[in-house]
């Protein structure tokens, strides 16, 4: 109960702060201020917006949107934005309520709108009053499919053009050029994943379903079905049994979460642990394309 109350008070506090900040926001500069929840969206905004936008990333590299708690700085950034880019499908549960108090002229881009979503993924963020909504949300990790990202780019281009009609052609050209790069990336990943000897693997959380669907792979099991919550002993036992039945025993951990439970499971099953990064934003995988190639190289090492 204390967690519920603390979270509710946090939301109310930040909503009040956001409302107060609306009266002190300076006139926007020449560049359009864009706020993005995760690093891939921030990169997309820069690719399409070029020198016409100022992009702010809300989550620091290495943070997980599943367990993120907003700060006053986050409230301030949202209050000053013209565009707010989110994945949607319940990923940014911490932002949805604050956006009700956002400036009237802010344009919210829901990346998952209109996407062929994978159903039935649980995302319990340990807030009891959110459980029913979160557990019925589709899988939000759409950005790990490059072709779905071409749809996201179209949404960002439309939002920028609506906000800044005089530069619509500029945004359209940038979007088209980047979409072509994403299609090339898709072909590259498709060609390289076809050479994998093993096509099943265990992941830390359910981030890789869209990637697997696109490239004919299979997530055999997920360690943390609810991000931030350690799995029950019975679930751990089941994962070990699944791993023991695979030709190549691989567990993919993630830098956003502690690897201890993944390492324990791998040790019991005689498996190897590799690290995939579903969010990027760090050195060597700062851009979306760098991040995807980084993950592809890790997968090749583990599964070929």
Label every model-predicted segment.
Residues 2-14:
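Bacterial N-terminal signal peptides that target proteins for export
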């Amino acid at each position: 109960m204390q967690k519920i109350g603390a979270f509710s008070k946090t939301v109310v506090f930040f909503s009040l702060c956001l409302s107060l900040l609306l009266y002190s926001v300076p006139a926007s500069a020449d560049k359009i201020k864009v706020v993005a929840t995760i690093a891939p969206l921030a990169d997309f905004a820069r690719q399409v917006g070029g020198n016409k936008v100022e992009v702010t990333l809300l989550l620091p590299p290495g943070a997980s949107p599943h367990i993120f708690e907003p700060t006053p700085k986050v409230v301030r950034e949202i209050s000053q934005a013209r565009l707010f880019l989110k994945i949607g499908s319940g990923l940014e549960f911490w932002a949805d309520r604050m956006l009700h108090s956002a400036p009237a002229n802010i344009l919210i881009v829901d990346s998952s709108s209109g996407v062929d979503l994978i159903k039935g993924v649980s995302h319990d963020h340990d807030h009891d009053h959110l459980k029913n909504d979160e557990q019925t949300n589709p899988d939000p990790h759409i950005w790990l499919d490059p072709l779905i990202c071409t749809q996201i780019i179209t949404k960002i281009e439309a939002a920028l053009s609506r906000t800044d009609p005089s530069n619509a052609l500029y945004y359209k050209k940038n979007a088209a050029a980047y979409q072509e790069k994403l299609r090339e990336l898709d072909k590259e990943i498709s060609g390289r994943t076809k050479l994998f000897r093993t096509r099943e693997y265990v992941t830390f959380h359910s981030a890789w379903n869209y990637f697997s669907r696109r490239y004919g792979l299979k997530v055999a099991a997920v360690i943390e079905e609810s991000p931030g919550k350690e799995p029950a002993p019975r679930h751990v036992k089941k994962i070990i049994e699944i791993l023991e039945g695979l030709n190549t025993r691989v567990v993919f951990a993630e830098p956003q979460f502690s690897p201890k439970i993944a390492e324990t499971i791998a040790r019991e099953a005689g498996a190897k642990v590799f690290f995939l990064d579903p969010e990027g934003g760090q050195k060597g995988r700062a851009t979306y394309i760098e991040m995807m190639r980084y993950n592809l190289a890790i997968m090749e090492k583990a599964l070929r």
